[in-house]
Regions:
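Glycan-recognition and catalytic cores of secretory/periplasmic carbohydrate-active enzymes
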Residues: 1-313
């Protein structure tokens, strides 16, 4: 196990983090390049996405918190300042979905998923450094989501809105998704950053939001017959429940456990542990004899998407 730990640390530092520092840093326009293709070619004119930049912010902040290397602090600060200066909507709140290579707003919609990742990144930077500005930004984004994207009538979080927080026709995260106003994926990546923010900002209002999100997972998103998590819903939480996503199942089983641990409530932890064991067992249905995990099961027609996508593995 110790050898595995050292091997993984070596891959993290010398193959992953080092690559992003030396290959993807945009020295001309700031931040990081928006695209490197499959042939390892940088595309300097590519747009820059909020999710990618927020994930960079989280990754280098977490790396610095654990490993304390100054180059990770520099990369984290670079990402923090770029997201702050170019993605934050200083007029309406929230963050833009994308900017052009120069840092000008491109797609200004408010995708709740992306705002969640920004909270994740800024809260991790605050956790790693004690930086008050990063914490203040994370708190402000939390309030933006709660004010504009939380549906108090039906419960849950709206998938996307316009820049001014008005209804938007196309709420999809990507072209392959159903156009539902509620998705499991977005709720997963709201409970994740809320949990991280709670580590550095323990307030009753945030705790209430997190507990409600746990209830949404157990009462709305969890299929009590299969113990898979269903993916797409409308405002009234009606959905087809026709897709089983093994990667999301195993991801959720870990993240929900992490949330329960951070809350520190033994009763909640006991309840969550019983459920996530069943979710993890359901995810095992996607495993194949070579140890890989296929992507999805479409219950309509009983077909499998046999792709082995990296994040699922």
């Amino acid at each position: 196990m110790e050898n595995l730990k050292e091997t993984m640390k070596d891959v993290l530092e010398n193959n992953i983090l080092n690559y992003w520092i030396h290959k993807v840093k945009d020295e001309e326009n700031g931040g990081f390049y928006g695209r490197v293709d499959g042939n390892d070619q940088v595309h300097p004119e590519a747009e820059k996405g909020a999710v990618m930049n927020a994930r960079i912010l989280w990754a280098f902040s977490a790396a610095y918190r654990v490993l304390k290397k100054p180059e990770y602090m520099e990369a984290a600060t670079r990402a923090k300042e770029y997201v702050r200066d170019h993605f934050l909507d200083k007029e309406y709140g929230g963050i833009y979905w994308s900017v052009d290579c120069k840092g000008n707003p491109l797609d200004t919609k408010k995708q709740t998923y992306a705002i969640g990742f920004a909270i994740y990144g800024f809260s991790e930077y605050a956790r790693a450094t004690g930086d008050q500005e990063a914490l203040d930004i994370a708190i402000s984004l939390y309030h933006d989501i709660e004010k504009h994207a939380f549906d108090a009538k039906n419960n849950g979080y709206i998938e996307a809105l316009t820049r001014e927080w008005n209804p938007i026709a196309d709420m999809r995260l990507s072209d392959k998704d159903e156009n539902g106003s509620r998705t499991m994926n977005t709720h997963l990546h709201i409970i994740e950053p809320y949990t991280n923010l709670y580590r550095v900002w323990k307030t009753p209002e945030l705790e209430k939001s997190i507990r409600n999100l746990l209830d949404i997972f157990t009462d709305k998103l969890l299929n009590k017959e299969t113990y898979h998590l269903d993916l797409f819903f409308n405002d009234e939480w009606e959905g087809k429940r026709n897709i089983e996503s093994y990667g999301h199942d195993i991801e959720a089983s870990w993240l929900l456990h992490e949330t329960a641990l951070v809350l520190g409530d033994k009763e909640v932890l006991h309840k969550v542990e019983r459920i996530i064991r069943r979710i993890a067992e359901a995810a095992d249905e996607g495993l194949r004899p070579d140890g890989s995990m296929v992507y999805e099961h479409w219950k309509d027609g009983d077909k499998f998407d046999l792709q082995r996508q990296w994040w699922v593995q």
